[in-house]
Amino acid sequence: MSVPAIAPRRKRLADGLSVTQKVFVRSRNGGATKIVREHYLRSDIPCLSRSCTKCPQIVVPDAQNELPKFILSDSPLELSAPIGKHYVVLDTNVVLQAIDLLENPNCFFDVIVPQIVLDEVRNKSYPVYTRLRTLCRDSDDHKRFIVFHNEFSEHTFVERLPNETINDRNDRAIRKTCQWYSEHLKPYDINVVLVTNDRLNREAATKEVESNIITKSLVQYIELLPNADDIRDSIPQMDSFDKDLERDTFSDFTFPEYYSTARVMGGLKNGVLYQGNIQISEYNFLEGSVSLPRFSKPVLIVGQKNLNRAFNGDQVIVELLPQSEWKAPSSIVLDSEHFDVNDNPDIEAGDDDDNNESSSNTTVISDKQRRLLAKDAMIAQRSKKIQPTAKVVYIQRRSWRQYVGQLAPSSVDPQSSSTQNVFVILMDKCLPKVRIRTRRAAELLDKRIVISIDSWPTTHKYPLGHFVRDLGTIESAQAETEALLLEHDVEYRPFSKKVLECLPAEGHDWKAPTKLDDPEAVSKDPLLTKRKDLRDKLICSIDPPGCVDIDDALHAKKLPNGNWEVGVHIADVTHFVKPGTALDAEGAARGTSVYLVDKRIDMLPMLLGTDLCSLKPYVDRFAFSVIWELDDSANIVNVNFMKSVIRSREAFSYEQAQLRIDDKTQNDELTMGMRALLKLSVKLKQKRLEAGALNLASPEVKVHMDSETSDPNEVEIKKLLATNSLVEEFMLLANISVARKIYDAFPQTAMLRRHAAPPSTNFEILNEMLNTRKNMSISLESSKALADSLDRCVDPEDPYFNTLVRIMSTRCMMAAQYFYSGAYSYPDFRHYGLAVDIYTHFTSPIRRYCDVVAHRQLAGAIGYEPLSLTHRDKNKMDMICRNINRKHRNAQFAGRASIEYYVGQVMRNNESTETGYVIKVFNNGIVVLVPKFGVEGLIRLDNLTEDPNSAAFDEVEYKLTFVPTNSDKPRDVYVFDKVEVQVRSVMDPITSKRKAELLLK
């Protein structure tokens, strides 16, 4: 704790002012330490207005010797008097509450963000801070956002007064900035408008002596805009806006209040409260779980009151419930979009899920749902699989973002053109519906829309949000693709001008020098002489058909001593992407390229990814090469790393390469090298498997598009050839070799990838299923034991069963993650799935930022060029790793969602009967995987029988017994059963999502 001890003192320096402040900091032992802080002020910080004639004369270059750009327009937006032509100054709360509005391309132009606002936003919400920084950094001739460093300007810096709170001082600093701008721009007839929702701040601005500041609340300012009708729906629902609604409606639904910060801190310290991230069940939106180190199994959070307004992914504080209330995981399926469909958005009445007393104002839970919940509660209490349960008592950090959804038709009055309260059903089925207010309800009924969440008061059953924009008509390819990109936080906007300015000026005409010692080329690139000329090597690339961003190429050559020279050559992306540039920052932010069925979202601009970096055949390209000497048993004799220049001889698809290798009439040197690579790759794979590497599976399919219409027309299971394994083995070998090299050179900050061993509890249910149904089990003593036990899971009557077990095992594994070497001890570096002690990603720098960092570290390790300080700093490496882990995971989910959408489109007119496998059994349905389409779907009990009440669920045998429709004989369905299902594509009438519907034959 610190308190001002002596009032701040200013003194004049040769080039400006400095402010000296002395404070006393209380120490742990009760003493006090005096600290003197000196704060330097400048007189040359410009206003950045193009109208200004004074500031261009005083401005000085920055550390990169560049002058700041004057961005604010000389003819800004003009509104009615007294505002006229004006710039906007924002306060912190407006930024925090209305960042969506600030990003709207149709409002808020020429905006001044005081530095103190930027600092406060950073302290309160880092995600919003990042979006605000992006607005300011990428500001162009359209939006024109700037940061004004008011804290370092002698004209705008204010000292904290005695007994003044920090918040009041910061508000005064914002007003001082407005006042200075108003006076500074007076000769140019440009006013300044302070937009703040703080009434006291607005009143203070008008009362201050000689103040000519114009102040408006956010709503007041929006109402003055010429396009107010179009953007009014995007105004966030804050408490002050919602008072009329609360007066006019009745609510008896109340969530528990969150614990105070002091109580939370004390509870965490005393061990009675726990912190973790909550994951909502994908099959039951009323059940979540939190993994805590103290417990071997996740702690369950069951019911609306216990979930207490937590969103999927929130960091929460939980308190354990008494052991008498511990339960087993739910055995029923509950979707949020089909639950409480009769709720009235104008009447926030609700159920207390503990006493089930419903309000007379609305039907919240149907009798059928109530019976289902009661039945599930009985099973959960009697089950032998009881787990600890808890309740959420505090939200440490919200995971709120922009969400995609559609209006619930039952909540909309299509005849009304006035403002309505309506529900939005979100695409993520783990999330509750959200109430928004809009005048465009009828217009938006068939649209995919984007919303943001503003708050979730205790008296509201559902969170409150606001409309951001519509993406287009439901089921249009453009709207659905943009929706899934937004849902998975994939950056898909075009690259900014600043990023594109980092690309080579020659564009597509750029060429690698013919000679590496050419004086003119060396003068432009002094490092050129350190490259190895490998253009004489017979190098080729092997990739999926149609690949244009070719990251890697290979070669093999017989050595005089009988060994093999094998080279892996990776695109030298870091030659073009330099640390500290806008291009590097954009690549780091995106983290990875994202591959959808119909498009690719690049991590780097297309000029690099598909041309200058791509190892295309017949042209010279810069590469980073790893060259081994291998013996006939594929043992490494030695390895060398080098920056190089190569010329690929051919670009093969996997199938083309396989045909070339298998064609016995082809005996040229390139083909012989490919055969050698295949032979060595088989030995490499065998050694990996013997060491315990896992051979897992996933239901991957490929969607074929019509060449003329670009519509999806066929789905097939991906076929793997020997050449797929050839490439994979040498990429793995390169990644392992590079990992060892960079760890030796940078033991604290090497960019690596680890895969933790799964805890036995992850396989508990799968092992119970296998033991009960097949008398089999999976061993987790080691990765080798796991691999061997998977090999033994074979059903002689069904060849696919082993693949099914591998698919289900994949879902029990831990996720691999990027990390820097200083974060873990060496034994924890191990990659469990690959059975290697150290691993990284090096071979795909065009599409993965991890590989870019690994390239830079390898260049530093071999003495090619010094390593950037960014990649030597643990804190910065930690931030990079956190981001690329999140982006990598989101990219995978986005790719799967794209396949799921297009598979649904293929099946629209192709209803068929297919073979499926039961992978889950619930109290009210079964989940079936259809390998042909790579989809899994829930078959609800309602679609299995006309009498759901007579069905019986056996949790021990993983069996559901029911009397099928049009039959009088009971049928038993077990997990792992092979079944015939009718597959068709249907659109859910509530969510407007097209999905595969399965019906049991």
UniProtKB/Swiss-Prot annotation:
Location(s), subcellular: Cytoplasm; Mitochondrion; Nucleus, Nucleolus
InterPro entries: Dis3_CSD2, NA-bd_OB-fold, PIN-like_dom_sf, PIN_dom, RNase_II/R, RNase_II/R_CS, RNR_Ribonuclease, Rrp44_CSD1
Enzyme class: hydrolase
Subunit and interaction comment: Component of the RNA exosome complex. Specifically part of the catalytically inactive RNA exosome core complex (Exo-9) which associate with the catalytic subunits RRP6 and DIS3 in cytoplasmic- and nuclear-specific RNA exosome complex forms. Exo-9 is formed by a hexameric base ring of RNase PH domain-containing subunits and a cap ring consisting of CSL4, RRP4 and RRP40; DIS3 associates with the base ring of Exo-9. Interacts with GSP1.
Molecular function GO labels: 3'-5'-RNA exonuclease activity; endonuclease activity; RNA endonuclease activity; tRNA binding
Protein name (database record): Exosome complex exonuclease DIS3
PANTHER family membership: EXOSOME COMPLEX EXONUCLEASE RRP44, RIBONUCLEASE
Biological process annotations from GO: exonucleolytic trimming to generate mature 3'-end of 5.8S rRNA from tricistronic rRNA transcript (SSU-rRNA, 5.8S rRNA, LSU-rRNA); mRNA processing; nonfunctional rRNA decay; nuclear mRNA surveillance; nuclear mRNA surveillance of mRNA 3'-end processing; nuclear polyadenylation-dependent CUT catabolic process; nuclear polyadenylation-dependent rRNA catabolic process; regulatory ncRNA 3'-end processing
Protein family (similarity comment): Belongs to the RNR ribonuclease family.
Note: Present with 606 molecules/cell in log phase SD medium.
Record keyword Hydrolase present: yes
Residue ranges constituting the CSD2 domain according to the UniProt record: 422-489
Gene name in the database record: DIS3
Keyword terms: Cytoplasm, Endonuclease, Exonuclease, Exosome, Hydrolase, Mitochondrion, Nuclease, Nucleus, RNA-binding, rRNA processing
Species whose genome carries this gene: Saccharomyces cerevisiae (strain ATCC 204508 / S288c)
EC identifiers of the protein: 3.1.13.-, 3.1.26.-
Region spans: Endoribonuclease: 1-235
Residue ranges with Acidic residues bias: 343-356
Highest taxon listed in the record's lineage: Eukaryota
Region Disordered, residue ranges: 343-363
Residues in RNB domain copies: 531-861
Reported cofactor(s): Mg(2+)
All residue ranges annotated as the S1 motif domain in the record: 904-1001
GO cellular component: cytoplasmic exosome (RNase complex); exosome (RNase complex); mitochondrion; nuclear exosome (RNase complex); nucleolus; nucleus
Role: Catalytic component of the RNA exosome complex which has 3'->5' exoribonuclease activity and participates in a multitude of cellular RNA processing and degradation events. In the nucleus, the RNA exosome complex is involved in proper maturation of stable RNA species such as rRNA, snRNA and snoRNA, in the elimination of RNA processing by-products and non-coding 'pervasive' transcripts, such as antisense RNA species and cryptic unstable transcripts (CUTs), and of mRNAs with processing defects, thereby limiting or excluding their export to the cytoplasm.
CSD1 domain segment(s): 252-399
